[in-house]
């Protein structure tokens, strides 16, 4: 029997697919929709210290090759999501979950993580170090000194399972430098990648979204090659205890297969989930299993990370 089961840290999942933070995760109702689908798990909307309305609309647009957005981290506040996943966990009848959070300053991040540390929540936390769409706030993970200081500080008090959502890197030296930092800490996972920041899509001489004069994060087909490169680069550089979640350009079983081939333990779907809805998880799972059967693979471990190079 072909299995797409996988593991992140000590958490086991019966499938390798889930939503990406930002899609089908703003409200409890949306999260329950994902929970009831064939997704292995869900990740919440990135929760900040306070409720945020986000950037002015229109702030999202589908395009021929994917999407562009400048959402600006709209969310109901981290407490809303923390209380929800904590309540689900208490029932003992739900999948393991991911709680996505970030502060708009180091102090806010510390306040949020200490609150989670003091709570009953024992699931995974995804610390978002890569949102490109908050005006005046740079992507943290592009500043290696700040990233190192942040991780060094948080692991002095935070002992629950935690991973980080990364922006795309484009330079081999940056892969080396980032991995050297991440390998110093007990991270459960890294998520590669968030949208490619500050793209521009034009239609009939006009930009598609309002914030930042049309500049926004690019998702979908545009970013799959970059996402695959980041997944594989970190798979080759990170210690085995740090799992990799692949995100970017996944809309078919073949896309998911390629992320796993590059080293991903789980795969998140964003733009295509927004376009198709939670039924996408059933379709992509079937397509992935069909590929595995055709190639004689029984489990993800049979091919994870086994990308072949040209002689």
Curated annotation (Swiss-Prot):
It is found in: Cytoplasm. Pathway: Pyrimidine metabolism; UMP biosynthesis via de novo pathway. The active site is at 131 (nucleophile). Its EC number is 1.3.98.1. One of its GO terms (molecular function) is dihydroorotate dehydrogenase (fumarate) activity. Keywords: Cytoplasm, Flavoprotein, FMN, Oxidoreductase, Pyrimidine biosynthesis. It is an enzyme of class 1 (oxidoreductase). It comes from the Bacteria. Pfam families: DHO_dh. GO terms for biological process: 'de novo' pyrimidine nucleobase biosynthetic process; 'de novo' UMP biosynthetic process. Its cofactor is FMN. Its main location: cytoplasm. Substrate binds at residues 45, 69-73, 128, 194-195. FMN binds at residues 45-46, 128, 165, 193, 220, 248-249, 270-271. The keyword Oxidoreductase applies. It catalyses: (S)-dihydroorotate + fumarate = orotate + succinate. One of its GO terms (cellular component) is cytoplasm. PANTHER family: DIHYDROOROTATE DEHYDROGENASE (FUMARATE), DIHYDROOROTATE DEHYDROGENASE (QUINONE), MITOCHONDRIAL-RELATED. Catalyzes the conversion of dihydroorotate to orotate with fumarate as the electron acceptor. This is Putative dihydroorotate dehydrogenase A (fumarate). It comes from Streptococcus pyogenes serotype M5 (strain Manfredo). The gene is pyrD.
